[in-house]
Swiss-Prot record:
Glycans are attached at N225, N416. It is a multi-pass membrane protein. Glucose transport is thought to be mediated by two kinetically distinct systems, a glucose-repressible high-affinity system and a constitutive low-affinity system. The gene is HXT3. The modification Phosphoserine is found at S23. It holds the Pfam family Sugar_tr. This is Low-affinity glucose transporter HXT3. The chain crosses the membrane at residues 58-78, 114-134, 141-161, 172-192, 199-219, 234-254, 338-354, 361-378, 386-406, 429-449, 467-487, 489-509. The keyword 4Fe-4S does not apply. The keyword Acyltransferase does not apply. Residues 1-30 are annotated as: Disordered. Keywords: Glycoprotein, Membrane, Phosphoprotein, Repeat, Sugar transport, Transmembrane, Transmembrane helix, Transport. It is found in: Membrane.
Length: 567
Protein backbone atom coordinates (compact mmCIF):
# COMPACT_ATOMS: atom_id res chain seq x y z
CA UNK A 1 0.00 0.00 0.00
CA UNK A 2 1.08 3.55 -0.68
CA UNK A 3 -1.01 5.27 1.96
CA UNK A 4 0.75 7.52 4.44
CA UNK A 5 0.60 6.67 8.15
CA UNK A 6 -1.54 8.77 10.50
CA UNK A 7 1.47 10.49 12.05
CA UNK A 8 2.62 11.96 8.77
CA UNK A 9 -0.67 12.88 7.21
CA UNK A 10 -3.55 14.11 9.35
CA UNK A 11 -5.36 14.94 6.14
CA UNK A 12 -5.79 11.26 5.34
CA UNK A 13 -7.64 10.62 8.57
CA UNK A 14 -9.76 13.70 8.17
CA UNK A 15 -11.06 12.46 4.85
CA UNK A 16 -12.22 9.13 6.23
CA UNK A 17 -15.93 9.87 6.43
CA UNK A 18 -18.92 8.26 4.80
CA UNK A 19 -19.42 11.35 2.70
CA UNK A 20 -16.01 10.89 1.07
CA UNK A 21 -15.53 7.17 0.73
CA UNK A 22 -13.84 6.97 -2.68
CA UNK A 23 -10.65 8.51 -1.30
CA UNK A 24 -10.40 5.93 1.49
CA UNK A 25 -11.30 3.01 -0.73
CA UNK A 26 -8.63 3.94 -3.24
CA UNK A 27 -5.95 3.91 -0.54
CA UNK A 28 -6.83 0.35 0.40
CA UNK A 29 -7.15 -0.87 -3.19
CA UNK A 30 -3.82 0.62 -4.35
CA UNK A 31 -5.64 2.81 -6.86
CA UNK A 32 -5.26 6.55 -7.50
CA UNK A 33 -7.68 8.75 -5.54
CA UNK A 34 -10.61 9.76 -7.72
CA UNK A 35 -13.38 11.41 -5.72
CA UNK A 36 -15.89 11.09 -8.55
CA UNK A 37 -15.61 7.30 -8.84
CA UNK A 38 -17.98 5.00 -6.93
CA UNK A 39 -19.38 1.67 -7.87
CA UNK A 40 -23.15 1.34 -8.09
CA UNK A 41 -23.41 -0.76 -4.97
CA UNK A 42 -21.63 1.80 -2.82
CA UNK A 43 -23.66 4.70 -4.18
CA UNK A 44 -26.86 2.79 -3.48
CA UNK A 45 -25.76 2.03 0.07
CA UNK A 46 -24.86 5.66 0.71
CA UNK A 47 -28.29 6.77 -0.45
CA UNK A 48 -29.90 4.76 2.33
CA UNK A 49 -27.33 5.34 5.07
CA UNK A 50 -26.92 9.09 4.63
CA UNK A 51 -29.25 11.48 6.40
CA UNK A 52 -31.37 13.11 3.64
CA UNK A 53 -31.75 16.26 5.70
CA UNK A 54 -28.51 18.04 4.80
CA UNK A 55 -29.72 21.63 4.93
CA UNK A 56 -28.11 24.40 6.93
CA UNK A 57 -30.21 23.68 10.03
CA UNK A 58 -30.13 19.89 9.75
CA UNK A 59 -28.33 19.36 13.05
CA UNK A 60 -29.57 22.34 15.07
CA UNK A 61 -32.08 20.33 17.10
CA UNK A 62 -29.71 17.51 18.02
CA UNK A 63 -26.92 20.01 18.77
CA UNK A 64 -29.09 21.91 21.25
CA UNK A 65 -30.16 18.66 22.90
CA UNK A 66 -26.58 17.42 23.20
CA UNK A 67 -25.36 20.73 24.63
CA UNK A 68 -28.01 20.43 27.35
CA UNK A 69 -26.74 16.96 28.18
CA UNK A 70 -23.13 18.15 27.99
CA UNK A 71 -23.91 20.76 30.65
CA UNK A 72 -23.12 17.99 33.12
CA UNK A 73 -19.49 18.77 32.34
CA UNK A 74 -20.03 22.34 33.56
CA UNK A 75 -20.87 20.98 37.02
CA UNK A 76 -17.53 19.19 37.21
CA UNK A 77 -15.63 22.15 35.77
CA UNK A 78 -17.19 24.52 38.28
CA UNK A 79 -15.91 22.38 41.15
CA UNK A 80 -12.41 22.25 39.66
CA UNK A 81 -12.31 26.02 39.13
CA UNK A 82 -13.62 26.96 42.57
CA UNK A 83 -11.79 24.49 44.83
CA UNK A 84 -8.42 25.75 43.56
CA UNK A 85 -9.31 29.16 44.99
CA UNK A 86 -11.06 27.97 48.16
CA UNK A 87 -7.85 26.49 49.60
CA UNK A 88 -6.22 29.94 49.40
CA UNK A 89 -9.12 32.05 50.77
CA UNK A 90 -8.84 33.53 54.26
CA UNK A 91 -12.26 32.54 55.61
CA UNK A 92 -11.92 28.98 54.29
CA UNK A 93 -8.50 28.68 55.95
CA UNK A 94 -9.84 30.08 59.24
CA UNK A 95 -12.76 27.64 59.34
CA UNK A 96 -11.13 24.45 58.09
CA UNK A 97 -7.42 25.02 58.58
CA UNK A 98 -4.95 25.02 61.47
CA UNK A 99 -3.32 27.90 63.32
CA UNK A 100 0.33 28.92 63.15
CA UNK A 101 2.10 30.23 66.24
CA UNK A 102 1.92 33.72 64.76
CA UNK A 103 -1.89 33.52 64.58
CA UNK A 104 -2.20 32.92 60.83
CA UNK A 105 -4.19 30.02 59.44
CA UNK A 106 -3.08 27.36 57.00
CA UNK A 107 -4.09 24.01 55.53
CA UNK A 108 -1.59 21.21 56.00
CA UNK A 109 -0.49 19.33 52.90
CA UNK A 110 -2.47 16.27 53.99
CA UNK A 111 -5.64 18.25 54.62
CA UNK A 112 -5.25 20.23 51.40
CA UNK A 113 -4.71 17.06 49.41
CA UNK A 114 -7.72 15.35 50.97
CA UNK A 115 -10.12 18.28 50.55
CA UNK A 116 -9.11 18.82 46.93
CA UNK A 117 -8.78 15.23 45.75
CA UNK A 118 -11.33 13.19 47.75
CA UNK A 119 -13.90 14.48 45.27
CA UNK A 120 -12.24 12.21 42.69
CA UNK A 121 -12.71 9.13 44.86
CA UNK A 122 -16.41 9.93 45.09
CA UNK A 123 -16.47 10.33 41.32
CA UNK A 124 -14.78 6.96 40.76
CA UNK A 125 -17.27 5.17 43.01
CA UNK A 126 -20.22 7.04 41.53
CA UNK A 127 -19.13 6.26 38.00
CA UNK A 128 -19.06 2.51 38.70
CA UNK A 129 -22.16 2.23 40.90
CA UNK A 130 -24.52 4.92 39.62
CA UNK A 131 -23.89 4.51 35.88
CA UNK A 132 -26.00 1.35 36.13
CA UNK A 133 -29.02 3.63 36.57
CA UNK A 134 -28.73 4.45 32.88
CA UNK A 135 -29.31 0.80 31.99
CA UNK A 136 -32.11 0.34 34.50
CA UNK A 137 -34.19 3.49 34.05
CA UNK A 138 -32.81 5.15 30.93
CA UNK A 139 -30.02 7.64 30.37
CA UNK A 140 -32.21 10.69 31.06
CA UNK A 141 -33.66 9.47 34.36
CA UNK A 142 -30.22 8.24 35.42
CA UNK A 143 -28.81 11.73 34.87
CA UNK A 144 -31.59 13.34 36.89
CA UNK A 145 -30.97 10.99 39.84
CA UNK A 146 -27.20 11.59 39.93
CA UNK A 147 -27.72 15.36 39.75
CA UNK A 148 -29.97 15.12 42.83
CA UNK A 149 -27.20 13.22 44.64
CA UNK A 150 -24.80 15.99 43.65
CA UNK A 151 -27.16 18.59 45.17
CA UNK A 152 -27.20 16.68 48.49
CA UNK A 153 -23.40 16.85 48.61
CA UNK A 154 -23.44 20.60 47.94
CA UNK A 155 -25.93 21.16 50.79
CA UNK A 156 -23.61 19.35 53.21
CA UNK A 157 -20.65 21.49 52.11
CA UNK A 158 -22.52 24.79 52.44
CA UNK A 159 -23.79 23.79 55.89
CA UNK A 160 -20.23 23.19 57.15
CA UNK A 161 -19.30 25.66 59.90
CA UNK A 162 -15.84 24.79 61.15
CA UNK A 163 -15.47 21.02 60.81
CA UNK A 164 -13.27 20.19 57.86
CA UNK A 165 -14.40 16.56 57.84
CA UNK A 166 -18.03 17.65 57.27
CA UNK A 167 -16.91 19.56 54.20
CA UNK A 168 -14.83 16.51 53.28
CA UNK A 169 -17.91 14.21 53.45
CA UNK A 170 -19.92 16.66 51.35
CA UNK A 171 -17.27 16.55 48.64
CA UNK A 172 -17.37 12.75 48.56
CA UNK A 173 -21.15 12.76 48.09
CA UNK A 174 -21.12 15.47 45.42
CA UNK A 175 -18.36 13.47 43.75
CA UNK A 176 -20.67 10.44 43.59
CA UNK A 177 -23.10 12.51 41.54
CA UNK A 178 -20.47 13.97 39.24
CA UNK A 179 -19.00 10.50 38.66
CA UNK A 180 -22.38 9.30 37.42
CA UNK A 181 -22.73 12.39 35.23
CA UNK A 182 -19.28 11.82 33.71
CA UNK A 183 -20.38 8.39 32.43
CA UNK A 184 -24.00 9.06 31.50
CA UNK A 185 -23.57 12.43 29.74
CA UNK A 186 -21.04 11.31 27.08
CA UNK A 187 -22.93 8.01 26.77
CA UNK A 188 -26.27 9.69 26.01
CA UNK A 189 -24.67 12.15 23.59
CA UNK A 190 -22.86 9.38 21.69
CA UNK A 191 -26.10 7.38 21.37
CA UNK A 192 -28.22 10.34 20.24
CA UNK A 193 -25.79 12.23 17.98
CA UNK A 194 -25.55 11.45 14.23
CA UNK A 195 -22.25 9.78 13.37
CA UNK A 196 -21.23 12.80 11.24
CA UNK A 197 -21.24 15.02 14.35
CA UNK A 198 -20.69 12.56 17.17
CA UNK A 199 -17.09 13.58 17.85
CA UNK A 200 -17.96 17.28 17.92
CA UNK A 201 -21.02 16.84 20.12
CA UNK A 202 -19.31 14.54 22.63
CA UNK A 203 -16.52 17.14 22.78
CA UNK A 204 -19.13 19.63 23.98
CA UNK A 205 -18.93 17.80 27.33
CA UNK A 206 -15.30 18.88 27.66
CA UNK A 207 -16.20 22.37 26.42
CA UNK A 208 -18.67 22.67 29.28
CA UNK A 209 -15.98 21.52 31.72
CA UNK A 210 -13.69 24.32 30.57
CA UNK A 211 -16.51 26.88 30.75
CA UNK A 212 -17.19 25.76 34.32
CA UNK A 213 -13.51 26.06 35.23
CA UNK A 214 -13.29 29.56 33.74
CA UNK A 215 -16.44 30.88 35.43
CA UNK A 216 -15.35 29.22 38.68
CA UNK A 217 -12.09 31.16 38.52
CA UNK A 218 -14.00 34.37 37.80
CA UNK A 219 -16.35 33.81 40.75
CA UNK A 220 -13.43 33.22 43.12
CA UNK A 221 -11.86 36.44 41.87
CA UNK A 222 -15.12 38.29 42.52
CA UNK A 223 -15.52 37.01 46.08
CA UNK A 224 -11.89 36.97 47.28
CA UNK A 225 -12.07 40.44 48.85
CA UNK A 226 -14.89 39.49 51.23
CA UNK A 227 -13.75 38.62 54.74
CA UNK A 228 -16.51 36.15 55.59
CA UNK A 229 -17.98 32.91 54.23
CA UNK A 230 -19.30 34.73 51.15
CA UNK A 231 -15.85 33.91 49.72
CA UNK A 232 -16.72 30.25 49.28
CA UNK A 233 -20.43 29.82 50.07
CA UNK A 234 -21.61 31.96 47.15
CA UNK A 235 -19.70 29.86 44.56
CA UNK A 236 -21.07 26.72 46.21
CA UNK A 237 -24.59 28.12 46.28
CA UNK A 238 -24.49 28.75 42.55
CA UNK A 239 -24.16 24.99 42.09
CA UNK A 240 -27.90 24.75 42.76
CA UNK A 241 -28.61 26.88 39.70
CA UNK A 242 -26.43 24.68 37.46
CA UNK A 243 -28.03 21.50 38.80
CA UNK A 244 -31.59 22.77 38.34
CA UNK A 245 -30.78 23.98 34.83
CA UNK A 246 -29.56 20.51 33.91
CA UNK A 247 -32.61 18.78 35.39
CA UNK A 248 -34.86 21.15 33.45
CA UNK A 249 -32.90 20.55 30.26
CA UNK A 250 -33.48 16.80 30.51
CA UNK A 251 -37.20 17.35 29.82
CA UNK A 252 -36.36 18.55 26.30
CA UNK A 253 -33.77 15.90 25.41
CA UNK A 254 -34.85 12.72 23.59
CA UNK A 255 -34.00 9.40 25.22
CA UNK A 256 -31.27 7.24 23.71
CA UNK A 257 -32.80 5.26 20.81
CA UNK A 258 -30.45 2.40 21.65
CA UNK A 259 -31.77 2.23 25.21
CA UNK A 260 -35.36 2.45 23.96
CA UNK A 261 -34.86 -0.45 21.55
CA UNK A 262 -33.26 -2.47 24.33
CA UNK A 263 -36.31 -1.70 26.51
CA UNK A 264 -38.67 -2.81 23.73
CA UNK A 265 -40.01 0.70 23.07
CA UNK A 266 -39.63 0.64 19.29
CA UNK A 267 -42.07 3.45 18.51
CA UNK A 268 -40.37 5.73 21.03
CA UNK A 269 -36.98 4.85 19.52
CA UNK A 270 -38.28 5.72 16.06
CA UNK A 271 -39.58 9.06 17.39
CA UNK A 272 -36.22 9.79 19.04
CA UNK A 273 -34.31 9.10 15.81
CA UNK A 274 -36.80 11.23 13.90
CA UNK A 275 -36.40 14.15 16.30
CA UNK A 276 -32.62 14.29 16.36
CA UNK A 277 -32.28 13.81 12.59
CA UNK A 278 -35.22 16.09 11.65
CA UNK A 279 -36.56 13.38 9.34
CA UNK A 280 -40.08 11.93 9.17
CA UNK A 281 -40.50 8.76 11.30
CA UNK A 282 -41.47 6.69 8.25
CA UNK A 283 -38.48 7.77 6.13
CA UNK A 284 -36.24 4.89 4.87
CA UNK A 285 -33.24 6.45 6.60
CA UNK A 286 -34.93 6.18 10.00
CA UNK A 287 -36.01 2.61 9.25
CA UNK A 288 -32.45 1.70 8.24
CA UNK A 289 -30.97 3.21 11.41
CA UNK A 290 -33.58 1.46 13.53
CA UNK A 291 -32.91 -1.91 11.90
CA UNK A 292 -29.18 -1.60 12.54
CA UNK A 293 -29.80 -0.79 16.21
CA UNK A 294 -32.34 -3.61 16.55
CA UNK A 295 -29.90 -6.09 15.04
CA UNK A 296 -27.21 -4.97 17.48
CA UNK A 297 -29.57 -5.28 20.45
CA UNK A 298 -30.79 -8.73 19.34
CA UNK A 299 -27.23 -9.92 19.00
CA UNK A 300 -26.51 -8.70 22.53
CA UNK A 301 -29.63 -10.41 23.90
CA UNK A 302 -28.68 -13.69 22.25
CA UNK A 303 -25.37 -13.55 24.09
CA UNK A 304 -27.12 -13.02 27.45
CA UNK A 305 -26.63 -10.33 30.08
CA UNK A 306 -23.12 -8.95 30.29
CA UNK A 307 -21.00 -9.65 33.36
CA UNK A 308 -18.09 -7.58 34.62
CA UNK A 309 -15.78 -10.40 33.61
CA UNK A 310 -16.90 -10.05 30.00
CA UNK A 311 -15.08 -6.71 29.85
CA UNK A 312 -11.89 -8.77 29.78
CA UNK A 313 -12.99 -12.05 28.19
CA UNK A 314 -15.70 -11.02 25.70
CA UNK A 315 -15.57 -10.82 21.94
CA UNK A 316 -14.61 -9.09 19.77
CA UNK A 317 -11.37 -7.93 21.42
CA UNK A 318 -13.04 -6.78 24.65
CA UNK A 319 -9.86 -7.11 26.73
CA UNK A 320 -8.01 -4.89 24.28
CA UNK A 321 -10.86 -2.37 24.20
CA UNK A 322 -11.30 -2.25 27.96
CA UNK A 323 -7.58 -1.78 28.56
CA UNK A 324 -7.47 0.88 25.86
CA UNK A 325 -10.31 2.78 27.55
CA UNK A 326 -8.58 2.57 30.92
CA UNK A 327 -5.24 3.68 29.47
CA UNK A 328 -6.66 6.63 27.53
CA UNK A 329 -8.54 7.91 30.57
CA UNK A 330 -5.49 7.37 32.81
CA UNK A 331 -3.18 9.13 30.39
CA UNK A 332 -5.58 12.05 30.15
CA UNK A 333 -4.94 12.67 33.85
CA UNK A 334 -1.23 11.97 33.47
CA UNK A 335 -0.99 14.87 31.04
CA UNK A 336 -0.79 16.88 34.28
CA UNK A 337 -3.76 19.14 33.60
CA UNK A 338 -4.98 19.03 37.19
CA UNK A 339 -1.55 20.08 38.39
CA UNK A 340 -2.44 23.45 36.88
CA UNK A 341 -6.20 23.48 37.41
CA UNK A 342 -6.33 22.26 41.03
CA UNK A 343 -3.23 24.11 42.16
CA UNK A 344 -3.08 26.94 39.63
CA UNK A 345 -3.28 29.61 42.33
CA UNK A 346 -0.43 27.98 44.25
CA UNK A 347 1.68 27.59 41.09
CA UNK A 348 1.27 31.25 40.22
CA UNK A 349 2.32 32.27 43.72
CA UNK A 350 5.45 30.16 43.32
CA UNK A 351 6.47 31.95 40.11
CA UNK A 352 6.00 35.36 41.71
CA UNK A 353 2.68 36.51 40.26
CA UNK A 354 1.25 39.42 42.26
CA UNK A 355 -2.41 38.36 41.93
CA UNK A 356 -2.59 34.62 41.43
CA UNK A 357 -6.41 34.64 41.35
CA UNK A 358 -6.38 37.05 38.44
CA UNK A 359 -3.75 35.08 36.57
CA UNK A 360 -5.79 31.88 37.01
CA UNK A 361 -8.49 33.53 34.91
CA UNK A 362 -5.97 33.66 32.05
CA UNK A 363 -5.70 29.87 32.27
CA UNK A 364 -9.48 29.62 32.22
CA UNK A 365 -9.79 31.81 29.11
CA UNK A 366 -7.09 29.89 27.21
CA UNK A 367 -8.66 26.59 28.24
CA UNK A 368 -12.17 27.54 27.13
CA UNK A 369 -11.30 29.02 23.75
CA UNK A 370 -8.86 26.21 22.99
CA UNK A 371 -11.61 23.68 23.67
CA UNK A 372 -13.81 25.59 21.23
CA UNK A 373 -11.16 24.81 18.60
CA UNK A 374 -11.42 21.12 19.46
CA UNK A 375 -15.02 21.06 18.21
CA UNK A 376 -13.47 21.48 14.76
CA UNK A 377 -10.29 19.43 15.10
CA UNK A 378 -11.85 16.25 16.51
CA UNK A 379 -13.84 15.51 13.36
CA UNK A 380 -11.50 17.28 10.95
CA UNK A 381 -8.25 15.50 11.81
CA UNK A 382 -9.57 12.39 13.52
CA UNK A 383 -9.06 10.93 16.98
CA UNK A 384 -5.64 9.36 16.49
CA UNK A 385 -3.91 12.34 14.92
CA UNK A 386 -5.20 14.71 17.58
CA UNK A 387 -3.97 12.44 20.38
CA UNK A 388 -0.57 11.94 18.72
CA UNK A 389 0.10 15.59 17.94
CA UNK A 390 -1.30 16.66 21.30
CA UNK A 391 1.18 14.42 23.11
CA UNK A 392 4.08 15.86 21.09
CA UNK A 393 2.96 19.43 21.81
CA UNK A 394 2.67 18.83 25.55
CA UNK A 395 6.10 17.19 25.70
CA UNK A 396 7.64 20.32 24.16
CA UNK A 397 5.78 22.61 26.58
CA UNK A 398 6.84 20.61 29.64
CA UNK A 399 10.49 20.62 28.55
CA UNK A 400 10.52 24.43 28.53
CA UNK A 401 8.26 24.90 31.57
CA UNK A 402 10.19 22.51 33.81
CA UNK A 403 13.65 23.55 32.58
CA UNK A 404 13.01 27.24 33.16
CA UNK A 405 11.48 26.52 36.57
CA UNK A 406 14.44 24.42 37.64
CA UNK A 407 17.28 26.55 36.26
CA UNK A 408 16.08 30.16 35.95
CA UNK A 409 13.16 30.93 38.27
CA UNK A 410 15.23 31.45 41.44
CA UNK A 411 18.65 32.76 40.35
CA UNK A 412 19.72 33.30 43.97
CA UNK A 413 18.20 30.15 45.37
CA UNK A 414 14.65 29.21 46.28
CA UNK A 415 13.00 31.72 48.60
CA UNK A 416 15.37 34.56 47.65
CA UNK A 417 13.22 36.23 45.04
CA UNK A 418 12.11 34.94 41.68
CA UNK A 419 12.98 36.10 38.18
CA UNK A 420 10.02 37.92 36.63
CA UNK A 421 11.16 37.02 33.11
CA UNK A 422 11.45 33.33 33.97
CA UNK A 423 8.05 33.42 35.67
CA UNK A 424 6.43 35.03 32.63
CA UNK A 425 8.05 32.44 30.36
CA UNK A 426 6.63 29.63 32.50
CA UNK A 427 3.14 31.15 32.39
CA UNK A 428 3.32 31.47 28.59
CA UNK A 429 4.34 27.84 28.12
CA UNK A 430 1.75 26.73 30.64
CA UNK A 431 -0.80 28.44 28.39
CA UNK A 432 0.69 26.69 25.33
CA UNK A 433 0.36 23.43 27.24
CA UNK A 434 -3.30 24.13 28.00
CA UNK A 435 -3.92 24.86 24.32
CA UNK A 436 -2.39 21.51 23.32
CA UNK A 437 -4.32 19.67 26.03
CA UNK A 438 -7.68 21.36 25.46
CA UNK A 439 -7.67 20.82 21.69
CA UNK A 440 -6.69 17.16 21.87
CA UNK A 441 -6.59 14.94 24.95
CA UNK A 442 -9.18 16.81 27.01
CA UNK A 443 -12.20 16.15 24.76
CA UNK A 444 -10.99 13.18 22.74
CA UNK A 445 -10.49 10.89 25.73
CA UNK A 446 -14.27 11.07 26.26
CA UNK A 447 -14.97 10.72 22.54
CA UNK A 448 -12.83 7.59 22.24
CA UNK A 449 -14.41 5.71 25.15
CA UNK A 450 -17.93 6.70 24.08
CA UNK A 451 -17.29 5.15 20.64
CA UNK A 452 -15.30 2.06 21.61
CA UNK A 453 -17.68 -0.28 23.43
CA UNK A 454 -20.73 -2.28 22.24
CA UNK A 455 -24.10 -1.48 23.79
CA UNK A 456 -24.43 -4.49 26.11
CA UNK A 457 -21.25 -3.66 28.06
CA UNK A 458 -21.07 0.06 27.40
CA UNK A 459 -22.10 1.39 30.81
CA UNK A 460 -19.81 -1.05 32.64
CA UNK A 461 -16.84 -0.40 30.36
CA UNK A 462 -17.23 3.39 30.42
CA UNK A 463 -17.61 3.40 34.20
CA UNK A 464 -14.39 1.38 34.63
CA UNK A 465 -12.51 3.65 32.22
CA UNK A 466 -13.70 6.86 33.86
CA UNK A 467 -13.00 5.38 37.30
CA UNK A 468 -9.36 5.08 36.23
CA UNK A 469 -9.46 8.78 35.31
CA UNK A 470 -10.85 9.72 38.72
CA UNK A 471 -8.39 7.48 40.55
CA UNK A 472 -5.44 9.16 38.88
CA UNK A 473 -7.09 12.51 39.54
CA UNK A 474 -7.16 11.65 43.24
CA UNK A 475 -3.53 10.51 43.28
CA UNK A 476 -2.33 13.63 41.47
CA UNK A 477 -4.53 15.93 43.55
CA UNK A 478 -3.48 14.40 46.86
CA UNK A 479 0.24 13.92 46.26
CA UNK A 480 0.99 17.07 44.26
CA UNK A 481 1.59 19.25 47.38
CA UNK A 482 4.09 16.68 48.69
CA UNK A 483 5.80 16.14 45.34
CA UNK A 484 6.16 19.84 44.53
CA UNK A 485 7.45 20.39 48.05
CA UNK A 486 10.16 17.78 47.44
CA UNK A 487 11.16 18.28 43.78
CA UNK A 488 9.37 21.49 42.83
CA UNK A 489 9.32 22.11 39.07
CA UNK A 490 11.14 18.86 38.30
CA UNK A 491 7.57 17.56 38.53
CA UNK A 492 7.06 18.75 34.96
CA UNK A 493 9.55 16.15 33.72
CA UNK A 494 7.37 13.40 35.22
CA UNK A 495 4.40 14.48 33.12
CA UNK A 496 6.66 14.90 30.10
CA UNK A 497 7.71 11.25 30.40
CA UNK A 498 4.07 10.20 30.64
CA UNK A 499 3.32 12.02 27.38
CA UNK A 500 6.21 10.32 25.60
CA UNK A 501 4.71 6.99 26.64
CA UNK A 502 1.24 8.20 25.58
CA UNK A 503 2.47 8.93 22.06
CA UNK A 504 3.71 5.37 21.53
CA UNK A 505 0.66 3.85 23.20
CA UNK A 506 -1.78 5.73 20.97
CA UNK A 507 0.13 4.86 17.82
CA UNK A 508 0.15 1.13 18.47
CA UNK A 509 -3.16 0.59 20.29
CA UNK A 510 -5.77 3.26 19.47
CA UNK A 511 -7.71 2.85 16.18
CA UNK A 512 -9.41 5.65 14.25
CA UNK A 513 -13.19 5.70 14.77
CA UNK A 514 -14.08 8.97 13.04
CA UNK A 515 -17.11 8.78 10.76
CA UNK A 516 -18.22 5.31 11.88
CA UNK A 517 -21.44 4.26 13.58
CA UNK A 518 -21.12 2.53 16.94
CA UNK A 519 -22.03 -0.76 15.25
CA UNK A 520 -19.35 -0.26 12.56
CA UNK A 521 -16.72 0.32 15.25
CA UNK A 522 -17.61 -3.10 16.63
CA UNK A 523 -17.20 -4.64 13.17
CA UNK A 524 -13.77 -3.05 12.79
CA UNK A 525 -12.57 -4.61 16.04
CA UNK A 526 -14.02 -7.96 14.95
CA UNK A 527 -11.89 -7.87 11.79
CA UNK A 528 -8.69 -7.24 13.77
CA UNK A 529 -7.66 -4.10 11.89
CA UNK A 530 -4.26 -2.72 12.92
CA UNK A 531 -4.69 0.67 14.67
CA UNK A 532 -2.16 2.49 12.46
CA UNK A 533 -4.05 1.30 9.36
CA UNK A 534 -7.55 1.82 10.76
CA UNK A 535 -8.14 5.17 9.03
CA UNK A 536 -8.36 3.24 5.75
CA UNK A 537 -10.98 0.77 6.99
CA UNK A 538 -14.34 0.87 5.18
CA UNK A 539 -17.61 -0.63 6.51
CA UNK A 540 -18.78 -3.85 4.85
CA UNK A 541 -21.83 -2.29 3.20
CA UNK A 542 -19.70 0.34 1.42
CA UNK A 543 -16.76 -1.66 0.06
CA UNK A 544 -15.82 -1.88 -3.57
CA UNK A 545 -15.13 -5.15 -5.36
CA UNK A 546 -11.33 -4.79 -5.00
CA UNK A 547 -11.28 -3.86 -1.32
CA UNK A 548 -8.39 -5.66 0.40
CA UNK A 549 -9.44 -6.17 4.02
CA UNK A 550 -6.52 -8.51 4.72
CA UNK A 551 -3.99 -5.74 4.03
CA UNK A 552 -5.26 -3.82 7.08
CA UNK A 553 -4.62 -6.74 9.42
CA UNK A 554 -0.92 -7.37 8.73
CA UNK A 555 2.23 -5.27 8.74
CA UNK A 556 5.69 -6.86 8.70
CA UNK A 557 7.66 -3.60 8.68
CA UNK A 558 9.95 -2.59 11.59
CA UNK A 559 8.22 -0.34 14.13
CA UNK A 560 10.13 2.78 13.05
CA UNK A 561 8.88 2.35 9.49
CA UNK A 562 5.35 1.82 10.77
CA UNK A 563 5.55 5.16 12.52
CA UNK A 564 7.60 7.31 10.17
CA UNK A 565 7.87 5.58 6.82
CA UNK A 566 5.48 5.27 3.91
CA UNK A 567 3.53 2.07 3.60
Amino acid sequence: MNSTPDLISPQKSSENSNADLPSNSSQVMNMPEEKGVQDDFQAEADQVLTNPNTGKGAYVTVSICCVMVAFGGFVFGWDTGTISGFVAQTDFLRRFGMKHKDGSYYLSKVRTGLIVSIFNIGCAIGGIILAKLGDMYGRKMGLIVVVVIYIIGIIIQIASINKWYQYFIGRIISGLGVGGIAVLSPMLISEVAPKEMRGTLVSCYQLMITLGIFLGYCTNFGTKNYSNSVQWRVPLGLCFAWALFMIGGMTFVPESPRYLVEAGQIDEARASLSKVNKVAPDHPFIQQELEVIEASVEEARAAGSASWGELFTGKPAMFKRTMMGIMIQSLQQLTGDNYFFYYGTTVFNAVGMSDSFETSIVFGVVNFFSTCCSLYTVDRFGRRNCLLYGAIGMVCCYVVYASVGVTRLWPNGEGNGSSKGAGNCMIVFACFYIFCFATTWAPIAYVVISETFPLRVKSKAMSIATAANWLWGFLIGFFTPFITGAINFYYGYVFMGCMVFAYFYVFFFVPETKGLTLEEVNDMYAEGVLPWKSASWVPTSQRGANYDADALMHDDQPFYKKMFGKK
